[in-house]
């Protein structure tokens, strides 16, 4: 197939958007959450594990910046770091996620400790950051295009969670509201980079595989949570009820 003619920009964008069929909004764990069937433990488990993703996103974006020689791209991409880490004197998305944790009944210090992060989630997120460090900056930037589908998932939480989970403090939804606008802005930039960079059929097919890789990461995170919080089979469940898994190895 790589010998075929390249897709036009419109066709390539359509192929990218078609990957939305595999976005984690369709994972049974997410479906249960927005349909109101999730338990308190399942929501808390999702918030705690997703926090590891949140704190690593700036690491991913910093890797892209470090590998990118284009000053104009860096000037725009750096906003993603500020969105999550916060500008001087301002809170960012990480603090907003900590407030979401408090809203669902989790202690911020426990979230920061990452003691609840499942190995499967940690491995998936670490693979994403490692990819961003080793790939070309264009490929790493393009891997962020799961943001094409992000506004829908944030809106689904805002629409359904207040109705189904009145025990959650509404102040915790700030992160989802903020990301609605940020994700749409980020998509425009990431999509422009992608459509400009991948102009051969082989390159376009590789990009579709990169996007699938990112989708695999998001889906695998929820698979790990399903095992732990839906099937009650966390790591080592057959030999102990303690959380024996590692809490992160510093290299």
From Swiss-Prot:
Q: Which Gene3D superfamilies match?
A: Heme oxygenase-like (1.20.910.10)
The biological processes this protein is annotated with in GO are: pyrroloquinoline quinone biosynthetic process; sulfur compound metabolic process
Q: Which Pfam families match?
A: TENA_THI-4 (PF03070)
Keyword Oxidoreductase in record: yes
* Biochemical pathway: Cofactor biosynthesis; pyrroloquinoline quinone biosynthesis
Instruction: Provide any one GO MF term from the record.
Output: pyrroloquinoline-quinone synthase activity
What catalytic activity is recorded? 6-(2-amino-2-carboxyethyl)-7,8-dioxo-1,2,3,4,7,8-hexahydroquinoline-2,4-dicarboxylate + 3 O2 = pyrroloquinoline quinone + 2 H2O2 + 2 H2O + H(+)
Q: Which domain of life is it from?
A: Bacteria
Say if the entry is tagged with keyword Magnesium.
Answer: no
EC numbers listed for it are: 1.3.3.11
Give the keywords, sorted: Oxidoreductase, PQQ biosynthesis
- Relate the protein's function as given in its record: Ring cyclization and eight-electron oxidation of 3a-(2-amino-2-carboxyethyl)-4,5-dioxo-4,5,6,7,8,9-hexahydroquinoline-7,9-dicarboxylic-acid to PQQ.
NCBIfam families from the UniProt entry: PQQ_syn_pqqC (TIGR02111)
Its family remark reads: Belongs to the PqqC family.
Identify this protein by name. Answer: Pyrroloquinoline-quinone synthase
Q: Which organism's genome codes for this protein?
A: Pseudomonas putida (strain ATCC 700007 / DSM 6899 / JCM 31910 / BCRC 17059 / LMG 24140 / F1)
Q: Which gene encodes it?
A: pqqC
